[in-house]
């Protein structure tokens, strides 16, 4: 993959911060961001909101996918939007509140920008 970034210090290929092994970083910054995110969710609990999921697979669905589905089902004003190259889907319970686009995320975003 030609676009993979490399560490400027040691030259090793960089990876995403995923809960797949012992390299996941859950430091002070992670907890600060987590608290801000939870505060945002509480403040917008029953308001009009779009839960936008970009490229989330089934590696750790309990982190993003399942909570988005749950929050959408509990809020009639919510819309669950998923853009994924191969795994764009939602449960039947929230189908009427969902937009699932199975396509390349970059192309979808370029198309949206071109339509403005």
Label the predicted regions.
Residues 2-116:
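Conserved catalytic alpha/beta core of Sir2/sirtuin-type deacylases, generalized to analogous enzyme cores
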